């Protein structure tokens, strides 16, 4: 599945989930899926907890997060080299 095809699985609608990016057809925020992955959950763990999702939905969240990281960044204090 191409990157563009994956992103078709993400929806942003002001009337759904407060306009937050979510998985199309579901009220599951992209950020929630990314938080699960960041905390150590595997794709399989997420699919077990959310059986209505498909593997490609989780991959779409990762692709969306990667695109956002290319466009924006979070301020993190610089660490001095030791």
Question: What is each of the regions a protein language model found here?
Answer:
Residues 1-27:
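N-terminal first-folded block
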Residues 2, 11, 31, 39-42, ...:
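Generic serine detector
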Residues 11, 15-16, 37, 68, ...:
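Generic ordered-secondary-structure signal
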Residues 55-79:
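C-terminal structural segments of small proteins and small subunits
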């Amino acid at each position: 599945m191409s990157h563009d095809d994956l992103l078709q699985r993400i929806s942003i609608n002001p009337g759904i989930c407060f306009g937050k990016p979510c998985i199309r057809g579901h009220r599951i925020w992209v950020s929630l899926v990314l938080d699960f992955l960041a905390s150590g959950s595997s794709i399989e763990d997420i699919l077990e907890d959310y059986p209505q999702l498909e593997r490609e939905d989780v991959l779409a969240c990762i692709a969306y997060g990667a695109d956002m990281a290319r466009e924006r960044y979070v301020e993190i204090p610089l660490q001095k080299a030791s």
